[in-house]
């Protein structure tokens, strides 16, 4: 796969049972979402609700088809969208978009699911409590397990086009963090007071690594994707009690780049850096496997740094 490109469906309007936008309104919203990297803040949401005369939840479900447009699905051609409704640090409601991402000629287990993408978007951007998640299609078992790692797993609503559930309805008798003796969870991590003993590590990359949720491997790790003209994109490692549904830092960062409507190719990407915790490294192989799906990218820079005691 030479590149992964966000395809804007020009001259189309978003209209469904929840909301109806004109072509111009739809195009403006698409552009806004790319600029804001897949996030609508409280002001954006309130303005749209007033403009369209709809409720907050109607807007949430009505925008899911736009989330699906961010999908990069060269294998299945099946585009899935998800939007997390969550409270930020100020207690205001934001919408965090997500979509699936696939990688040609690599194991299907490397894909990013739409629910993972939306939750990752909320997590990386400071969301504190998930209230609802609206999805274009029923979540697979993998995604149900990923959601089971969340601090609010038993509380938030899962909204499908025609139905509404709690996670316990979809994942009864579940296996989660407490089964492994882990009292913490995604969005409720263990306190972090350590730092990397390497003064050459970029401060922001280190911050994303230290914010990783890694109770099972202790590999605090993050990825930075540097672009030529569109800034930097970061991703953090998010582990899961079932292990397989864990989200790698490269997948985390790539999902953020795709939500900005950017292509992952040599024309966009200037550099890719993976930071891992010395003695706990486990991400280089996965990162190289994902990158093998693409051509003419800069080489992956690997940094292994010890943590302070």
Curated annotation (Swiss-Prot):
Q: Which domain of life is it from?
A: Bacteria
| Co-factor(s) | Zn(2+)
Molecular function terms from GO: cytidine deaminase activity; identical protein binding; zinc ion binding
Q: Which residues bind Zn(2+)?
A: 113, 140, 143
Active site: residue positions: 115
Write down the chemical reaction(s) this protein catalyses. cytidine + H2O + H(+) = uridine + NH4(+); 2'-deoxycytidine + H2O + H(+) = 2'-deoxyuridine + NH4(+)
Pfam families per the record?
dCMP_cyt_deam_1, dCMP_cyt_deam_2
Give the record's GO CC terms. cytosol
Which InterPro entries does its entry note? APOBEC/CMP_deaminase_Zn-bd, CMP_dCMP_dom, Cyd/dCyd_deaminase_Zn-bd, Cyt/Deoxycyt_deaminase, Cytidine_deaminase-like, Cytidine_deaminase_bacteria
The cofactor note reads: Binds 1 zinc ion.
Q: Which GO terms describe its biological process?
A: cytidine deamination
Gene3D superfamilies given in the database record:
Cytidine Deaminase, domain 2
**Keywords attached to this entry:** Hydrolase, Metal-binding, Zinc
Residues involved in substrate binding: 100-102
Q: Which of the seven top EC classes does this enzyme belong to?
A: hydrolase
Task: State the EC number(s).
Answer: 3.5.4.5
CMP/dCMP-type deaminase domain boundaries: 55-178, 196-309
The entry describes its oligomerization and partners as: Homodimer.
Alphabetical list of HAMAP family matching this protein: Cyt_deam
- Give a short account of what the protein does: This enzyme scavenges exogenous and endogenous cytidine and 2'-deoxycytidine for UMP synthesis.
Similarity section: Belongs to the cytidine and deoxycytidylate deaminase family.
Name of this chain's protein: Cytidine deaminase
């Amino acid at each position: 796969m030479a590149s992964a490109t966000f395809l804007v469906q020009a001259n189309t309007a978003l209209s469904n049972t929840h909301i109806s936008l004109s072509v111009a309104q739809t195009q403006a919203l698409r552009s806004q979402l790319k600029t804001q990297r897949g996030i609508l803040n409280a002001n954006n949401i309130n303005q749209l609700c007033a403009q369209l005369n709809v409720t907050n939840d109607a807007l949430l479900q009505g925008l899911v088809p736009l989330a699906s447009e961010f999908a990069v699905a060269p294998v299945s051609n099946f585009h899935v969208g998800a939007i997390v409704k969550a409270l930020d640090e100020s207690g205001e409601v934001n919408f965090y978009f997500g979509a699936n991402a696939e990688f040609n000629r690599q194991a299907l287990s490397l894909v990013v699911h739409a629910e993972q993408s939306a939750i990752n978007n909320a997590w990386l951007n400071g969301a504190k409590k998930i209230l609802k998640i609206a999805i274009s299609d029923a979540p697979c078992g993998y995604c149900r397990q990923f959601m089971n790692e969340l601090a609010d797993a038993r509380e938030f609503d899962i909204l499908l086009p025609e139905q509404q559930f709690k996670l316990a309805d979809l994942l009864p008798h579940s296996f989660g963090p407490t089964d492994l003796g882990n009292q913490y969870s995604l969005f409720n991590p263990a306190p972090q007071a350590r730092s990397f003993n390497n003064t050459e590590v970029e401060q922001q990359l280190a911050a994303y690594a230290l914010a990783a949720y890694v109770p099972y491997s202790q590999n605090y790790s993050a990825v930075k994707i540097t672009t030529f003209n569109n800034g930097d994109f970061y991703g953090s490692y998010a582990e899961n009690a079932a292990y397989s549904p864990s989200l790698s830092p490269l997948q985390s960062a790539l999902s953020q780049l795709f939500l900005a409507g950017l292509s992952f190719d040599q024309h966009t990407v200037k550099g890719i850096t993976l930071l891992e915790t010395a003695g706990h490294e486990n991400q280089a192989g996965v990162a190289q496997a994902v990158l093998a799906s693409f051509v003419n990218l800069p080489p992956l820079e690997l940094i292994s740094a010890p943590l302070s005691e």
